[in-house]
Design a protein with these regions (language model features):
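Bacterial Sec-dependent N-terminal signal peptides
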Residues: 1-23
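A broadly tuned, weak detector of single residues within folded domains
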Residues: 3-6, 13, 43, 105, ...
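N-terminal, helix-rich and Lys/Arg-enriched segments in bacterial and organellar proteins
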Residues: 5-6, 12, 47, 51, ...
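A generic secondary-structure boundary signal that marks alpha-helix termini
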Residues: 16, 59-60, 343
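Short, positively charged
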Residues: 22-27, 309
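Active-site nucleophile-adjacent alpha helix/oxyanion-hole segment immediately C-terminal to the catalytic cysteine
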Residues: 25-212, 216-254, 358
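Active-site signature of cysteine proteases
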Residues: 161-168, 172-395
Length: 395
């Protein structure tokens, strides 16, 4: 896109700044509604570890909110323990578990409770000839070793040595002790020093095939730990997200980014409406009435002008889930709210694809319509949930 500048309000960490009032060539003008300081954008590179990068970013933002200061925590320290937990689960399930690189926020919390955490400078998780993460070969070897154990119906001492050596080779040896800012820690004592309680962080979802205000395990492959989540009506899920962001609590988001309306390159994610012209404004309707549906979509996906979006109901959302159109592709970090010149709400979203893949510092804005349709679940601190909703959930 040949834009001189695409401004996405709040699309920046506490170390970057672009005015929300500047206008981009494509016609999007964003104004801040809520903006929370967070740490810098990282790059998961050639790995399927978005779940860890998003959750780590979320936790780092929590430490900022708590007045603990700025931390750069090691994603790969957590990823390594997640792989260990997957291997255990897969073996107990007779090889029917999940050994992929993906996961969800619960895997981060469990790993943190089990082994603690270390700073990135202590364990960067790259022990091979690269300056970026790449787990393709690592994951292939992991699967091969796991398959042998399943075939033999036994995990020998050599099996455990092979696994440890595999991770040491690709990710580096785990530190028993380390010094950080002049003080000696173990991974567990460093985790304790942060003052975090994983029980404070709540997963919330919204689907109609399960009762509201009760917990269930969303049926997505990356929920291999079968984590129970609270089920809310869709409007209340959005209410939680808004309330949290407006009160200084960021939100970790899991959802579908496979749609054409999701454009990291253009810094936006939208959910165009091309059928119900009667719901459009006069200007939009006059413009879209001259086109067929295909042309309307093509126009919307140029990202050169604002377009009307789908009014997403619980039924529309559920249809996407049950037709497997909506999947748990990706986790990201919601760090604020902006509105465009028409007053449409968007969520400021910190991605983990580095800062070079778009001109907005690695951020984008996802419209409310897109978020309503494509969210699988969110993670938020319990104090970021409105009191009336907490009461309904018994939290």
């Amino acid at each position: 896109m040949n834009a001189k500048l695409l401004t996405v309000a709040g699309l920046l960490s506490c170390t970057t700044a672009i005015s929300a009032q500047e206008e981009n060539k494509s016609g999007y003008q964003f104004t801040d509604v809520a903006k929370i300081n967070v740490t810098s954008v990282k790059n998961q590179a050639s790995t399927g570890t978005c779940w860890c990068f998003a959750t780590t970013s979320f936790i780092e933002a929590e430490l900022l909110r708590m007045g603990k200061g700025e931390y750069d925590l090691s994603e790969m320290f957590i990823v390594r323990q997640k792989y260990m937990n997957q291997l255990q689960d897969n073996y107990i399930r007779r090889g029917k578990g999940t050994l992929g690189q993906g996961s969800i926020t619960n895997a981060w919390k469990n790993a943190f409770n089990e082994v603690g955490i270390v700073p990135e400078e202590v364990y960067d998780g790259i022990n091979y000839d690269s300056d970026k993460h790449n787990h393709r070969e690592l994951n292939q070897y992991l699967r091969a070793i796991a398959d042998v154990a399943i075939k033999n119906k036994h995990r020998s001492p050599e099996y455990y040595k092979l696994i440890d050596n595999l991770f040491d080779t690709y990710l580096g040896e785990l530190p028993a002790k380390f010094t950080y800012k002049g003080k000696e820690y173990t991974p567990k004592s460093f985790a304790a020093s942060l003052g975090l309680n994983m029980d404070d962080y709540i997963e919330l979802t919204s689907f109609t095939h399960q009762p509201y205000y009760q917990q269930f395990a969303p049926e997505v492959p990356d929920n291999w730990e079968r984590k129970l989540m609270y089920n809310l009506p869709l409007d209340e899920l959005i209410n939680v997200t808004d309330h949290a962001l407006k009160n200084g609590y960021t939100v970790c988001w899991d959802g579908d980014v496979s749609e054409k309306g999701f454009s990291h390159k253009n810094g936006v994610a939208i959910n165009p409406e091309v059928k119900k012209l009667e719901d459009m404004s006069g200007t939009d309707r006059a413009r879209f009435e001259k086109m067929d549906e295909k042309a309307r979509l093509e126009e919307a996906y140029k990202f050169e002008a604002l377009c009307p979006e789908v009014n997403v109901t619980p039924e529309i959302r559920q249809e996407g889930y049950e037709s497997f159109v909506t999947t748990d592709d990706h986790l990201m970090h919601l760090t604020g709210i902006v509105k465009d010149q028409n007053g449409t709400k968007y969520y400021v979203t910190k991605n983990s694809w580095g800062t070079e893949r778009n001109t907005f510092g690695g951020y984008l804005n996802m419209s409310e319509s897109y978020v309503r349709a494509k969210t699988i679940y969110i993670l938020v601190h319990k104090d970021g949930i409105p009191k009336d909703i907490k009461k309904k959930l018994g939290i």
